[in-house]
Amino acid sequence: MADKPDMAEIEKFDKSKLKKTETQEKNPLPSKETIEQEKQAGES
């Protein structure tokens, strides 16, 4: 592996080969309601 990227390689890269993907949240943060429910469940 070279330390510097190969500019010729970058320039000939074809962006059209990339396909658009839908971004999916792998680990969505819980809502405030969910957190409150879990707190209450833990206390009882």
From Swiss-Prot:
Family named by the database record: Belongs to the thymosin beta family.
Organism from which the protein derives: Oryctolagus cuniculus (Rabbit)
Xref: SMART domains: THY
Record CDD domains: WH2_BetaT (cd22059)
Disulfide bonds: none
Gene behind this protein: TMSB4
Molecular-function annotations in GO: actin monomer binding
N-acetylalanine PTM positions: A2
Gene Ontology biological process terms in this record: actin filament organization; regulation of cell migration
Cross-link position per record: Glycyl lysine isopeptide (Lys-Gly) (interchain with G-Cter in SUMO2): K12
Function: Plays an important role in the organization of the cytoskeleton. Binds to and sequesters actin monomers (G actin) and therefore inhibits actin polymerization.
Cited InterPro entries: Beta-thymosin, Beta-thymosin_sf
Keyword annotations of the record: Acetylation, Actin-binding, Cytoplasm, Cytoskeleton, Isopeptide bond, Phosphoprotein, Ubl conjugation
Record-level GO cellular component terms: cytoplasm; cytoskeleton
Residues with the Phosphoserine modification: S31
Modification sites for Phosphothreonine: T23, T34
Biased composition regions of type Basic and acidic residues, renumbered to the chain: 1-25, 33-44
Protein name, as recorded: Thymosin beta-4
Localization of this protein: Cytoplasm, Cytoskeleton
Expression tissues: Originally found in thymus but it is widely distributed in many tissues.
N6-acetyllysine, modified sites: K4, K12, K26, K32, K39
Region: Disordered, residue numbers: 1-44
